[in-house]
Amino acid sequence: ALLKEKKLPFGISCCYTSQNFASISSDEYFDQMVEWGASFVWYFHYMPIGNDAVPALLPTPEQREFMYHKIREARQNKPIFAMDFQNDGEFVGGCIAGGRRYFHINANGDCDPCVFIHYSNANIRDMNLLDVLRSPIFMAYHDGQAFNDNHLRPCPMLENPDKLREMVGKTGARSTDLQS
């Protein structure tokens, strides 16, 4: 309410699963976000990572296609900009991770190519940002883009795991998984 009151732009991040994809893409849900004052909504689909991952929550191809169309429909009909981390790959040329447009820094300062991919050779506490982006795993990401000619299947973990294994092996990146 405070951001809306002060007229500051803000967005909402949503994770859709095989169980909630219809409800969080409904007209009512979009209307609620607009009422709250959100300028944009950023959708991610569930990624089965971590010790307690539930692969059954990963959206099916049909559910991803449903979201593909619902988000484009919302862009045409709702006063909020909707983006989909996976399904908008065709607009951004595939995966945006690895420092191409985005990367993740965990609580220990490890710089991972993506919030979902916990491998690194760089820590922000030990090097500057430019050196992080020049680290072996980030350069492997740079050199490997696009990971798939089909930009709707851009992820080196989910849809192209052979590419991820190759990059980790080639660069000697270590696991930065804070759970295991």
What do these predicted regions represent?
Residues 96-100:
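Short, small/polar residue-rich loop motifs at catalytic or cofactor-binding pockets
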Residues 1-94, 107-108, 112, 116, ...:
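Radical SAM enzyme [4Fe-4S]-AdoMet core and its adjacent flexible, acidic
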Residues 116-180:
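Flexible mid-to-C-terminal extensions adjoining Fe-S/redox cofactors in radical SAM and related proteins
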Residues 94-95, 147:
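Short secondary-structure boundary/capping segments
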